[in-house]
Amino acid sequence: MRNALAAVITGLMAVSMAGCGEGEGEGDDAFTVGLLLPSSAVPRWERFDKPMIEKRVKALCPDCKVAYANAADDATIQRQQMNSLITRGARAIIVDAVDVKALRSSVQAADRAHVPVVAYDRLAEGPVSGFVSFDGAQVGRLQGKALLKAMGDKAKQRRIVMMNGDPVSPNTAWYRKGARSVLDDKVTIRKEYANLEWRTDIARGNMTAAISDLGPGRIDGVLAANDAIASGVISALKSAGVSPLLPVTGQGADLDAVQRIVKGEQTMTVYKSFRQEADVAASMAVALGHGRSVHAIATTTVDSPTTQDVPAVLLTPVPVTAGTIERTLVRDEVYSIHEICPANLRSACDRAGLTGPTTKDTKETKEKEKVKGGDPGGVPARAGVARHLQAVRRRPGAPGRGTATPGR
């Protein structure tokens, strides 16, 4: 069994070497940054987060390398991957924990070996040195507000089903708390489910059970914690013949969810800028690898069940509806209109106002704007993450220094 597990770990561990050249002031001291992501089933991790983190590490530390591994939703494999990075001499590790409690022993082992750990998206237990995520309570509030708006003026008489995330994830409670702060006393929550591993098939089964227990005519909306869960909910509604479909929320800005929004099947999603999160994580890891504090990067502190006052950056999530896809996801180059609008969705895209330039035109426009000194897609052109974080601190409603307790 150990040999088989070692083979899996070796197979999953991919090392990409950053090139040489002038960096952005972090020096030329070469070291390894470990990057451990939780899943290959969720598209964002390997399509967006991995290359963006690698690119930012290279910009900050040209002679550094990134050692990457994906846990494929297996907490045991992730612990072994982390222990391997420690043994191989990684000087800092970025990790999005499959199971925040199960990873505690590996975080403690890293601490004993003087290897700082940056918790990414989910706050791992144990002595982590930094944390970057999005304000989970605000994610839930955005979902709750969108659901109330979609149900209309008579929302107080409406009955909803809450489809929460994986109970193992601390963010699940965080999102739920934010949503309940908006929904309580305004709707009746008829059923509430935990969806293990955020899986679409489990969400479909739970929604099918809710329809069977309550009757399709006695549900007026569904608070789905993320886009994978929303997919299962919508599939169950279709199978039950519910028409028109009910308002259903989401989170993650998955491409198939964006297309469901265009078609009118999903009410909204919540976009969390992969670029911003990746930039902060890479900046923290490189600073820690050079033996520096991350307090200059952090904008707040958070507490886990094991560790208090973890330096953190909690970024601002953005709601996305059919009417805002172009100025959020397309503008940030998450997806092109060509990707969102294949031939079979052209009419729906026209109705949603997605009639902008082609991918080629968009890229040319972006390059022209970068030459002029601006980048509409997130972090300003030629500006480091430090300047971006200063802007975050100045932004109205941005988290200040204090204590927040995360909970997906």
Predicted regions and their residues:
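C-terminal motif of bacterial Sec signal peptides marking the signal peptidase cleavage site
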Residues: 15-19
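A residue-level marker of the well-folded mature domains of exported/periplasmic proteins
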Residues: 20-408
